[in-house]
Amino acid sequence: MGHGCSQNTNERRNTLGQFGLAHINDSGRRFASYLAINNLLALTTCYQKNSYGTWIHPRSKLHHQLDHILTDKSTSQFFTDAGVTQSLIDSDHRAVQCKVRLQSRLKKRSTTRQRLLQLDYSGLGCERKKDAFCQDVLERYNAQPENRSKYTRLATAVECVTRASLPRKTKPQPGWFSAAQNEITPLIQQRNDAMSKTFEKCTRSTTNKLRTARKSLKNAVSKAKSNWISSTCNTLNESSSAHGGTKMYWDTVGKLRNGLKKSQSCSERPMKKPDGTLCKTPEENAEVFKNHFQKLYGRQPVFDPSVLEHLHRHAIVSNCDHTPDDEEIIKATSRLKERGPGDSGICPQVWKAVIRHEQTFAILKAIIVDFWESEIAPAEWEVGLLKILAKKGDLSDPGNYRGIMLLETAYKIIAIILHDRLRPIQEGLDMEPQCGFCSGRGCTDCVFTVKIALKKRREHGLETWVLFLDLVKAFDRVPREMLWTILEKFGVPAKLVRLLKSLHANVQVKFTVNEVTNTIQCVIGVKQGDILGPLLFLFFLAAVMITWKKVHERPLCLYYTKYDDVLSGRRYNTKGEEFSLPDSEYADDTAVLFVSRESLVESTPLLIAHFARFGMEIHVGLPDKLSKSEILFVAAPDHTYEDSSTYDGADLTNVELGDGRYLPVVDIFKYLGSILSRDCRDDADVHARIDAASHAFGALRECLFTSTEVSYSAKKVVYEGLILSILLYGSEIWCLTEMLFNKLRVFHARCVRAMCRVTRLHTRMHRITTTELLQRLNLNTIDQYITRRQLRWLGHVARMERERLPRKLLTSWVRNKRPRGAPQFTYGRGVMKALKKAEIKKDSWYDIAQDRVVWRTLIYR
């Protein structure tokens, strides 16, 4: 086989190196295809040598490269050289050899935290064991020297008793097997015994017993897999697509794949140094992450405190700074989630057991009261164990990773108490556009607000410019001194502010990379992974947006509304309640609406400078870096322009900010998982949903959907809870034409045929209709699923309070005359079609929707 780098494609370079003989022939192409399918690399083509030929043709005397050394790509880093050498035997082939760098790895000694995580805490549910455990903790606590702090003594006692009294939990088997291990293990033993007897003496009796044992085992395995899949997806099936987003569904895909089929763990990636070269040792990798997080958490904040002079000082909220009582502490401890503990490794189950014993609870209460009165946090509460998680993008760049802090479980008790005290204050602020980290609100609220606002203006012949802001490391850049001032301005009692200062005074971040542990000081930002983090961030964002609206005035998008059941819009001169829509916010994902490019160009630099006064940085474009903040131009209908190709000479160039910085003007933008386009059509969003659902279905096709071991009922649960949730995310707001409906129907039918293991040829030959296949799986048509989701959301918005933006926009209109031409297919007309399909009268839907139970009964009948 010949090989030449001149004819290599980019895909082929992933399997073949750049060195070889002559040109690649048909055999070489088949060889490259084999390498790609099996994820292999030909080492002998990766190193430059004087000779590559391993065989000489007997007639032409031409050299051919036939012999190779193949390796898995994940282990290619251990090879240092590969090439051709002279064979020591009488053969027409030459030998190939390689050099391997091997390094023995000593078994890593587990830490105290890891040993505590390996224990089985289920025994603490027994009252007798719980009392004995607490009694042992009390004895250990009293036996320690009194010069140590109360929390240190209690934590040490809990750790010692936990390690001494609790057993190690058995290592779980992957996924479905662990749930049915007790039932399947005896059947495996029976099968093995029958097989041994058959090998010893093969008779009709032993063969029948072996056949029966195998059949019983196969049926049990099939049932166990179906039960495990149903239990895994039941919770997801009951949840709404507005909560959790696409990430929750992809996590479920990974869980199902790992539970049904063993997956391989990836190795540590080499990181890029500042000079662009890759790290070669674990120590260099750890040093890169240390420098990255030192720069992120150790930078001194830069802000302008004078900007807070525009923030109105609220009256101090009373009756929220008193010392926590027994009921409040017990309630906060009971709400602890059984997630990753902090550096000590003490799990929430232990503290839930501690509060059930009178004397140990008294010690825990004394620790909390001492902190509340002295305002000095225990040293253990100031250490956060940082878990480094990868984001999208180049994973050799440390900037594409984020850290989540695992905090002490006892600290979370006081954090929950403070959170419950601060939440009513935050909810009393004027933050109607904000939907992030707020109860009863989600992504769909923001997407609905922006989409309906843009479609209303386009329907009335108006252009809109939308600035989508992306903040750089928003959580990790909050200036704490400014945050404390903001809390005081919003009426938070001084006692609670001092307690928060104490909890953030000396935060230590500890993380391990490639078995190298580093600890750095964190002097900026709120803690990611802390229940207080999102709440404090909302206070901070409220101050930013409130001061922005007070300092800078600009033309706003005005709408008019009446709180009734008219959805199709009114005449442009109809009277109604006026309201404006300046922006829509989901945490730090902000969409700011402008009526013209001139207003946008004038306000954008001021907005960026305003965020900079609060220590925030907006992600803008540079000559060598793309921008994550973008501008979407939403045009009026095409027939309103003389030249629709240029929108009558509209300026669609990038918005220049000076010093080479810019913001691009784009045709489409992905906002909170939903795609917004220039013409306000939903084609791009539907296509993106079909692509995402196709990837999810393909990931589970082999191990689940086409498996004969999985029942139809289990397939239905997974398909409805996972695939349809991904496919129909955001469908509550879609304005679907018949062409888009057909595309969704085609995808739905293709998935149904795959789950029934029926091809299109079978359906034609045997005249099997899609309706019959849907009945086998007990599934509905895609039209029914979309109609139910749209009407469910319509009823939810109709029941909202009148101050909510989605409720106002539902029946709103723009005071501008509609342009001449065919009427557009609006959201109101789409919902009216859904009401007709559900056989709900158009003049009575609003009154029916006020009763949630009756409304859901009608749309699900």
Predicted features, each with a name:
Residues 61-64, 80, 91-94, 98-103, ...:
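Short linear motifs embedded in intrinsically disordered, charge-biased segments
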Residues 333, 337-347, 386, 396-406, ...:
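Conserved catalytic palm subdomain of right-hand nucleotidyl-transferase polymerases, strongest
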Residues 192, 322-334, 362-371, 421-422, ...:
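Inter-domain linker/hinge segments that demarcate the starts of reverse transcriptase
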Residues 20-28, 56-61, 88-90, 145-150, ...:
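Conserved, non-catalytic sequence blocks in retroelement Pol enzymes and Pol-derived host proteins
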Residues 176, 300-328, 376, 381-385, ...:
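Active-site-proximal segment of RNA-dependent polymerases
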Residues 1-217, 233, 795:
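A shared catalytic/ligand-binding motif for oxyanion handling
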Residues 105, 190, 198, 246-398, ...:
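Surface-exposed loop/turn segments and immediately adjacent short secondary-structure elements
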Residues 57-58, 65-66, 71-73, 92, ...:
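Basic/polar low-complexity segments
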